[in-house]
Every structure is written in C-alpha cells, then in structure tokens.
C-alpha cells in the first residue's frame, strides 16, 4: 500500500489526475444520457427480445460457484478476476443431476454465439440477459423477470481480430417513479502488444449521495486525502491505469497500478494467457 507524500512532483501528478477525472466526468455524464435513451428504446421490446433469444438457442451450458463477477463464467472482462480479490468466474458443469443447483444458464445459437444468460435461483430464471449483436458491438440487456424491467446494460466492442477493446456496464435506477436514470457506469478499455494484453484503463462513474458523502468526509476529516487538502473539486468519476506483465510462457503473472503516489506492483490473482 502506498503512503501519501506531498512532494511537489506528487502534488502535480494528483492535480493532473483530478483534471483528467473531471474531463472524463463530462464524458460519463453524456454516456448517462445516451444509455438512458437506450434503456427507453429497448424497454417496450423486452418480451420479444427474450422470446427470440430463447427460440434461437440450440445448446445450453450451466455454471456455478461464481462470485462478484458480471455474467459469471463468460464475463467479457479479461481483467476483473486478475485484479479484484474474491472475484471468480466459477466453473462450467460437465453434467446435470437432480442435485445440481447452477447459478447460470447460458444459451447459444447455431453460430455458437451466446444469445442469453439466465441467472437462476432453484432453477428459476430471476434475471435474463439478452445479447444483441451489431457488427463489432455486443449489447447486453439484463432483465428483471419479476417486473419485466431493465436493471443493467452492457456494451462490448471488439476489433477485427475479435479481441475485446472495451467493456461497459451500467446500472439502471430502481426508482420507477422517476424517468429512466443511470446510477453507475464502469468502462474498461484494453490495449495489446505482441505479448498480449498490455494495458487496461478503468473509468468508474458513481452518482454520489451528498448526505452520505458529507458523513464520510467528516469521519475522515483528520485523515484527509491529498485531493481534499489541495481543495480540488469533487468528482463522481475515478480513473485507474493498469500495466500487465507476461512471463516467459506468455501468461500474465503480475500487474502494476500507475499511481501519483508511487506505482504499485501486484501478483495476478490467476495466471492466464490473454
């Protein structure tokens, strides 16, 4: 864990990062509006989308033992289970018995494309994510089957070699009394070199509750962040930058978090070739 220092170099880097976050915040606010419009567009189509996905399915797979990761075993993010503790994809079940209790049901079409994901509770689909393919974009519409509403959106963009370039997730407000509102957005961007995955940038937007924010600030008023000490503007968007390193066999074995207070090196939580 880094220690906060207040050298001129560190202060300048902190200011630069906050300026970057403020600019990214403007982008995320525009994304909020775009994604809210996307929710409104798909909401009247949910039943048809779900029925079409189920009808097109020719094969199913099941998984369990996942924890804290989007879409379970088939999470699009190449980095979440490398850098987040307690985050795991789970495992695919080779056979199904009467005692099997899977977490997810994956539906594939005749082109072997994942077209829907059911989140299961005692074999009942409580949520269904429908995947829509448009050129290099795959949109995931996550539906609450109880009230037929959209609870999450995801967007994956791929390059011509089918490598994922970016992965976005957005949480839709559960307050049905208001117009469609996006509460949280996380955007991951990836770059590659001859070794494989090289860098990841993670941009997170969370619309903070000002009451809770003030309570937290007060509780830490004797241990202020450098941003607070410098009087920098508050920002609902945070930015993280990761560099990945590969061993001689091509596996990611460690990563570095680029930080104004000093870069931090960690061992990858699992070894994988990407």
Language-model regions, residue ranges each:
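Buried hydrophobic residues that stabilize the cores of well-folded domains
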Residues: 2-274
């Amino acid at each position: 864990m880094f220690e906060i220092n207040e050298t001129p170099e560190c202060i300048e880097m902190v200011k630069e990062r906050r300026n970057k976050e403020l600019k990214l915040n403007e982008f995320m606010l525009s994304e909020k509006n775009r994604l809210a419009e996307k929710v409104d567009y798909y909401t009247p189509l949910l039943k048809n989308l779900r029925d079409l996905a189920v009808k097109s399915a020719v094969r199913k797979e099941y998984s369990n033992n996942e924890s804290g990761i989007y879409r379970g075993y088939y999470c699009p993010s190449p980095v979440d289970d490398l850098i987040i503790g307690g985050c795991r994809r789970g495992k695919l079940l080779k056979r199904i018995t009467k005692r099997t209790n899977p977490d997810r049901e994956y539906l594939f079409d005749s082109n072997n494309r994942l077209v829907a994901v059911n989140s299961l509770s005692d074999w009942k689909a409580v949520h269904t994510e429908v995947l829509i393919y448009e050129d290099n974009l795959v949109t995931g519409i996550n539906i609450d089957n109880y009230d037929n509403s959209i609870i999450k959106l995801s967007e994956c963009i791929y390059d011509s070699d089918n490598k994922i370039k970016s992965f976005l997730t957005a949480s839709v407000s559960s307050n049905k009394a208001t117009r469609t509102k996006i509460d949280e957005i996380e955007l991951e961007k990836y770059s590659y070199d001859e070794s494989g995955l090289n860098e990841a940038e993670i941009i997170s937007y969370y619309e903070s509750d000002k009451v809770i924010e003030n309570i937290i600030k007060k509780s830490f008023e004797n241990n202020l962040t450098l941003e607070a000490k410098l009087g920098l503007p508050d920002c609902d968007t945070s930015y993280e930058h990761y560099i990945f390193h590969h061993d001689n066999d091509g596996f990611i074995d460690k990563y570095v978090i680029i930080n104004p207070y000093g870069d931090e090196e960690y061992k990858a939580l699992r070894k994988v070739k990407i």
